[in-house]
C-alpha cells in the first residue's frame, strides 16, 4: 500500500542500493546517503546559491519501513569554495540516530526515498523512506522498475518511475458476469 500511495502522489523518488559508505560500514567519518547534486538542487532550490556560506534547509524524514522516530534532516550546500576554502558539494545530513539508512546491516538493501514535491516549485519539506528488509520486498519493487544494480540509481517523478505499480492496482469494470465454470478454467477463443 505504501508503494501505491507514493506512485499515485506528488513525489520525486530516488532509488538505490545502500553502499557501505552510505551506511557507515566502511568506518569513514562522513557517514551519509549519497544523493547527486543535481537532485538536491531540484528538490531544494532555495539552497542553490553562493550569496551566503553553506545555505541549508530542514526536511522532515519519516521511515515507513522501520519503527524509528521521525527526524529533521538537513539539505545543505557546502559552498566554501566560493568563500576561500575548498568544499563544493550538496548533501542531505542528520538522518537521525537509529535510522536504517545508517545501519551497516542494511548495506546492499534496496532503498526508496520519496520526496514530497512542493506544488509551487519550492523546497521539498518531507521525505518518506523505505529500506527493504527482505528479498521479497525487493522483488516487488524490481518487478515494476527493473533490477537495481549496486552503484546505480533511479530517480524521477514517482508516477513515471513507479507507474507500473499504480496500473496494476486499477479497479476492473465488472459489467459482465463471468460464468462460474470459467472461474476454474478459462476457455480458449475457439471454445467461446
What are these regions (language model features)?
Residues 12-13, 87, 91, 165:
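Intrinsically disordered, low-complexity acidic/Q/S/K-rich activation/interaction tracts characteristic
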Residues 18, 75, 111-113, 192:
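Long, contiguous hydrophobic alpha-helical segments, chiefly transmembrane helices and signal peptides
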Residues 45-100:
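A broadly used, surface-exposed interaction patch
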Residues 90-127:
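Elongated alpha-helical scaffolds
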Residues 32-35, 84, 107:
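Non-membrane alpha-helical secondary structure
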Residues 1-65:
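OB-fold ssDNA-binding interfaces and closely related basic DNA-contact patches used
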Residues 118-192:
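Mixed-charge (acidic/basic) macromolecular-recognition segments
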Residues 23-26, 66-71, 120-124, 138-140:
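Short, surface-exposed beta-strand/loop "edge" segments at domain boundaries and coil↔beta transitions
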Amino acid at each position: 500500500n505504501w508503494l501505491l500511495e507514493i506512485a499515485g502522489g506528488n513525489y520525486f523518488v530516488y532509488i538505490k542500493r545502500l553502499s557501505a559508505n552510505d551506511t557507515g560500514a566502511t568506518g569513514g567519518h562522513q557517514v551519509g546517503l549519497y544523493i547527486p547534486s543535481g537532485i538536491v538542487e531540484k528538490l531544494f532550490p532555495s539552497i542553490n546559491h553562493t550569496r551566503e556560506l553553506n545555505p541549508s534547509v530542514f526536511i522532515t524524514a519519516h521511515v515507513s519501513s522501520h519503527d524509528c522516530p521521525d527526524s529533521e534532516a538537513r539539505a545543505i550546500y557546502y559552498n566554501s569554495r566560493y568563500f576561500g576554502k575548498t568544499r563544493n558539494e550538496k548533501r542531505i545530513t542528520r538522518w537521525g540516530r537509529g535510522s536504517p539508512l545508517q545501519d551497516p546491516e542494511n548495506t546492499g538493501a534496496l532503498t526508496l526515498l520519496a520526496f514530497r514535491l512542493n506544488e509551487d516549485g519550492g523546497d521539498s519539506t518531507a521525505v518518506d523512506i523505505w529500506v527493504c528488509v527482505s528479498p521479497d520486498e525487493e522483488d516487488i519493487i524490481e518487478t515494476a522498475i527493473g533490477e537495481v544494480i549496486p552503484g546505480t540509481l533511479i530517480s524521477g517523478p514517482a508516477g513515471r518511475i513507479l507507474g507500473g505499480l499504480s496500473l496494476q492496482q486499477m479497479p476492473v469494470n465488472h459489467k459482465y458476469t463471468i460464468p462460474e465454470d470459467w472461474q476454474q478454467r478459462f476457455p480458449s477463443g475457439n471454445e467461446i
